[in-house]
Amino acid sequence: MQRASESFDAIVVGSGISGGWAAKELTERGLRVLLLERGKHVEHAKDYANARKGPWEYPHRAGRSRDMIDAYPVLRRDYPLNEKNLDWWVNEKESPYTEVKRFDWYRGYHLGGRSLTWGRQSYRLSDLDFEANAKEGIAIDWPVRYADIAPWYDHVERHAGISGSIEGLPQLPDGQFDPPMPLNCAEATVAGRIAKKFSGRRMIPGRVANLTQPRPGRGRCQYRNACALGCPFGGYFSTQASTLPAAMATGRLTLKTFAIVTDIVFDRDRKRASGVRVLDAVTNATTEYSAKIVFLCASTLNSAWILMRSARDVWPGGLGSSSGELGHNLMDHHFRCGASGILPEHNDKTVYGRRPNGFYIPRFRNLFGDKRDYLRGFGYQGSASRQGWQRAVAELGVGGDFKDAMSMPGPWQIGSTGFGEMLPNHANRVTIDESRTDKWGLPVLSIDCETGENERLMRRDMMNDMAEMLEASGAREVRVNDNGSFPGMGIHEMGTARMGRDPKTSVLNAHNQVWDCLNLFVTDGSFMTSSACHNPSLGYMAFTARASAFAVEELKRGNL
C-alpha cells in the first residue's frame, strides 16, 4: 500500500446526489476537496451515448436480449432494463450481494451515480414526519425539526431547480419553485372533482427536478421524457449538470474515478478519521489518502458496508457501531399498488410533448382527525394520457377499417400507484458476508429486510382509496391492482446509520457526524431515522448542504 503525497481538507466518498452536493458546498466554502468515485468517468453530454437515439437504432429495438436477461438477475425482476439504459447499471456478476430475504438493489457505479437515473420527484419532509416517531413511540426521535432544515431546502431548491406549485398544505411544505409542469386537461378535470368531493385530498402537479426556466449552463426541460439516458441539455438536476460544474469552477476539486473506498482510516488516539483507503478498480493497487474531514456519501448500503469494515480493531461491528444500531433499521418505500380507469371525455384533446412528470396526491390518511388501523400513510404518483395503438395488440382486428381506427388516439386513461411509508425496524439489517467476494476480492453485503404488518394493512387503502377517487371523478372501467412490492424496488433505500439525540441509540448526531468520530459525516440515505412516504432525495441534498456548512465552521473553530 502506498500513501498519497498530497493531503486534502476534505474527502468526499461517492459522486451521486449527496456526494455532488458535498463537493460543491465544501469547495465553495474554501476547502480543497478530493472526490472519489468507484466507477467510470461520465462526461456531461459527451458520454450520454443513447440520449438522442430512437428505438429503431438498437439491435433489439430498445428491448431486452436473452444475454441481458441472463446477466442481470436482479434488474430483470422489475426494473425496465433495456438496451437504452444498460450503461448505467452495475454488472451484477462482478458485484454480487447476498439476499437473506428478497431485496432488489439497483446500483449505478459511475460518476454521478443515480443522479443520472433518479425519478426526480422532489418533496420536503414536514414536522408531521420529523415528530412521528416520538409521538407514536416508534424507534427513536429525529434530532431535528422542520425549522432546522427549511433554510437548507430553500438553498438546494434554488440551485437544483425544482418545478412545482404553491399549495399551502401542512403535510407537504411549499418550496422555492420554478413554475410547475401543468396538469393536462384530463388530470385537471379529475383534480377538480377530487377537491370538490373529498375533504383533505388534493391532486397537484408533481414537484420535479426538471427545469421549466433555464439556469446558467443549463437549458430548460425539452419534454423528451428521456431523462434516464442523461440529458445533454442539463434539463434535470444531476451531478454532471449542476453540482460538479460548480465545484470544478472553484479550482479546489480533485476528482478520481475507479476508486473503491474499502474503509475509513481511524486514528484511535485522536478519535478522528485521518483519511480513507482506496482500491484502484483497474490496477488493484491500494492507496491511502488523508484529509481533515471525510464525507461518506457512497449511497445507503455502500456507506454501511464501508463503516462496518472500518476501525474493527476498536469496534468489532465497525466505525459508528458503539450504539449497536449500525446496519439496522433499513427502509424503503412500498408501492405498485393503486388503481386505473378510463375517462369518457376530452376526446378532442391530446397531450403535448412527452412531459417527464405527472400528478401527485399528498398523504391524507391519519391526518386531520382521520384514524386508520395502521400508522403513517402514503401519497400517490400517476398520470393521464390518451391510449395508443398498443391498446389493440391483443385484439384480432384486420383490414382497412381496423387500421384507420388504430391510427387515432384511444380514450384517456388515468392511473396511479401509492408510495407508502415503511416503519423503521431494528430487525431489518445489513451485515457483511465474509463467505462471498466480488470481482476485487472484497466481501459482499448481506441484506435481511422485509415489510411488516403495518405496511400490509396500508396497502388495502392504497388500492381502494385511488379507485374511490377515480369512480367519484367519473372514470369508467376502474380497476384496482396490487402487484406486490419487495424492499429495494422503490430505489429509495435508507436507514442503517440513523441520526438521533443519544449516542447510545443512534449512529449520527443532528449534524450527520458519527458520534464515535466527529470529523466523519454521513449524508446519504443512511442517516434517515424514518422514511416518510415521499421521495427522499431532496432531503439528502438539504442535509448534505447543512452538514457541509457546519463542518467548515467547526474546522475554523478547531473542533475537528
Model-derived regions, located:
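N-terminal glycine-rich phosphate/pyrophosphate-binding loop and immediately adjacent elements
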Residues: Q2-N133, I138, P143, A147, ...
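Glycine-rich loop(s) and the adjacent beta-strand/alpha-helix scaffold that form part
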Residues: E28, R32, G39-P59, T250, ...
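Short, glycine/acidic-rich hinge or "gate" loops at secondary-structure transitions
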Residues: H44-D47, S163-G175, R476-G484, R557-L560
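Conserved redox-cofactor binding core of oxidoreductases
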Residues: P59-R66, D70-D104, Y109-H110, W118-R124, ...
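FAD cofactor-binding and catalytic pocket of flavoenzymes
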Residues: N85-R114, W118-G119, R124, W142-P143, ...
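Glycine- and acidic
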Residues: A134-I138, P173-F177, N225-C231, S290, ...
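A conserved FAD-binding loop/helix module that cradles the flavin
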Residues: S530-S548
